[in-house]
């Protein structure tokens, strides 16, 4: 059987010094020989999704030690995309994913840990830890901090509405919203700790870990504030020790991340993503994680899935009054997976960290087929309605579960929100390697759209143009040189899309970029155009007034310019160099320049590609 990795630093005469250091951390003589479980935490006071994680690492650690392991905690960085949004801080968000993956690898390999519990939550942290887990391929269990409760606000006209962070951003640019109402919205938008309350990137990724088989049922939807979430943390600690012993003592390689997150598991995760209209950022992260694990999963696989998986769930920003807490009441991710399973759209035989197969897990936890009391109790967990930064601080329950699969929050394959799924891959001469649109957030009236290009060389220029009347109904806004290399860092375009909404252009314009979008974006917003402009992509050839044609049903995006003209433009651009037409007021640090040097385009997950 394989020896514990940790024996490298705990056994043998030559490790006397290392054992001395282990003892200085609290390890006792009787502990040597036990598996060392790394508790990979991401606590920070900068991020509401992580502000409550400070003591949760030690909560897991105590459970690990009670189960017979040695627990050792360390932290990763965590960037709050909402706070970093709209300024140069956003340049650092996507590159932080690689730093997180690297830091986990560095700590785990340097100290020879045997397994991991990954305590993540927000946008780049779950993907970074997922990449590390696939790279390291040691037993790993994911448990996230959980979603925030949705905000509720009573406006000056007496209306009480549910809302979230994106509503605050849109309201800020809407001149019809009074200062008093804006203050009310701002104060109510983010009432508790946790990842922002819609189906944004953080919650999307935490939901996908359930489909991948690397987290426990309820991980994606149980509120950060609810007492039931505590059991997920405790069980994660116990499971990590169990998986560790199964691998090292029983030679069960089926518990390793690459045996669990196979190509079929990635297909399950993307089927879920498409069915629930998840953030387009998930495409980047799923592609990156697959590459780390040597899984042959590409944009073509995502395209194929998007053509046969329907949209079964719409959550903010795609449906303003529905939030993750409502998905939870409807049975959470296990019930969406259950509906996909009934429709023959799921691989049931993939493994998980908690059940022999995903199918077995669905049979136990899908409220549409299971009468298990533990499932009913879990999904009755409701918001407490009290602002707090304290985890597990309330135990409110819904009166009833939402089991309506015809008109409820989660629909059946027979009665979907739409036959087409919530994400689509478009290709054409404007994006030969593909681009992504969240169709769940696109109004049916603009699924086919054409208009003249309004070209901006940066997000900042686009924001200025939108706010100052430079964009009109019918325009196709093009924002380029914002890709992984060109930004660098592939900024999110949440402010341009939010400002289009606030100007009443949300259903009257399209936006295309080689950058990316926040999970909070909706509208005809097409991102990840590949290749990016800085890599010679055709988006760099678009000129003001060029006609751009978008056909989502047929999955095409076309720059309606003759090929001879495009060839002439390419020759001209080759001579000039692929860079913005004018200088940008943007300071690019050495750290970002290093990232840009090795970053691939979005269709490859924006991972680093090293020279051979």
Swiss-Prot record:
Stored InterPro entries: Dihydro-acid_dehy_C (IPR042096), DihydroxyA_deHydtase (IPR004404), DiOHA_6PGluconate_deHydtase_CS (IPR020558), ILV_EDD_C (IPR056740), ILV_EDD_N (IPR000581), IlvD/EDD_N (IPR037237)
Cofactor note: Binds 1 [2Fe-2S] cluster per subunit. This cluster acts as a Lewis acid cofactor.
UniProt keywords, alphabetically: 2Fe-2S, Amino-acid biosynthesis, Branched-chain amino acid biosynthesis, Iron, Iron-sulfur, Lyase, Magnesium, Metal-binding
The enzyme's E.C. designation: 4.2.1.9
SUPFAM superfamilies in alphabetical order: IlvD/EDD N-terminal domain-like, LeuD/IlvD-like
GO MF entries: 2 iron, 2 sulfur cluster binding; dihydroxy-acid dehydratase activity; magnesium ion binding
UniProt entry tagged with the keyword Amino-acid biosynthesis: yes
Family: Belongs to the IlvD/Edd family.
NCBIfam families per UniProt: ilvD (TIGR00110), PRK12448.1 (NF009103)
Protein name: Dihydroxy-acid dehydratase
Source organism: Cereibacter sphaeroides (strain ATCC 17023 / DSM 158 / JCM 6121 / CCUG 31486 / LMG 2827 / NBRC 12203 / NCIMB 8253 / ATH 2.4.1.) (Rhodobacter sphaeroides)
